[in-house]
Curated annotation (Swiss-Prot):
GO terms for cellular component: cytoplasm. ATP binds at G12, A13, G14, K15, G16, T17, R127, G168. Keywords: ATP-binding, Cytoplasm, Kinase, Nucleotide biosynthesis, Nucleotide-binding, Transferase. Consists of three domains, a large central CORE domain and two small peripheral domains, NMPbind and LID, which undergo movements during catalysis. The LID domain closes over the site of phosphoryl transfer upon ATP binding. Assembling and dissambling the active center during each catalytic cycle provides an effective means to prevent ATP hydrolysis. It is an enzyme of class 2 (transferase). Its main location: cytoplasm. The gene is adk. It catalyses: AMP + ATP = 2 ADP. This is Adenylate kinase.
């Protein structure tokens, strides 16, 4: 099975759930950029302090800072890994790739979890978060598609993209992902 992976997909597609399952089953390091940022901030590392200052101003953490945090995690990693939540844009991907080449850890596969909007909206509303109403969700999906479509094409052109239908049980989706990575 391929060992250096990216997960892409719209909000509600099950990326986090499937990433956790796959990482546990195959001893891959799960790199969720949101979790990594929170861990760096909590540990009060120099990168974490820089991120905290930006976040406390209500601003987005720069691509460069996220890349530095990802590099920090990968530079001593000899096993496999799964990046979840980064890159989200073509600009981020083109910044990430030279770093991975330098570390001699190129991406081996990109899993795109696809799901129709009706199911996505239903899943997200059922989570019960206060900001998950249909209008907000539709906007998030539109932003996702606008930002991520070029990224999907980029990885398709590189021959890395594996598309998995993310409708069904957690188990059946996990099996489909595993098959796509062999």
């Amino acid at each position: 099975m391929k060992q250096r992976l990216l997960f892409l997909g719209p909000p509600g597609a099950g990326k986090g759930t499937q990433a956790e399952r796959l990482c546990a089953a195959h001893e891959l390091m799960h790199l969720s950029t949101g979790d990594l940022l929170r861990a760096e901030v909590g540990a009060k590392t120099p990168l974490g302090q820089e991120a905290a200052a930006v976040m406390n101003r209500g601003e987005l953490v720069s691509d460069e800072l996220v890349l530095a945090i990802v590099e920090n995690q990968l530079k001593n990693q000899s096993g496999g890994w799964l990046l979840d939540g980064f890159p989200r844009t073509l600009i981020q991907a083109t910044a990430l790739e030279p770093l991975l080449e330098e570390l001699k850890q190129p991406i081996e596969a990109v899993v795109l979890l696809e799901l129709n909007d009706a199911v996505l909206i239903e899943r997200l509303i059922s989570r019960g978060r206060s900001d998950d109403n249909e209008s907000v969700i539709r906007n998030r999906l539109e932003v996702y598609r606008e930002k991520t479509a070029p990224l999907i094409d980029h990885y398709r052109q590189q021959g890395l993209l594996q598309t998995v239908e993310a409708q069904g049980s957690i188990e059946s989706i996990a099996i489909s992902i595993e098959k796509s990575l062999c």
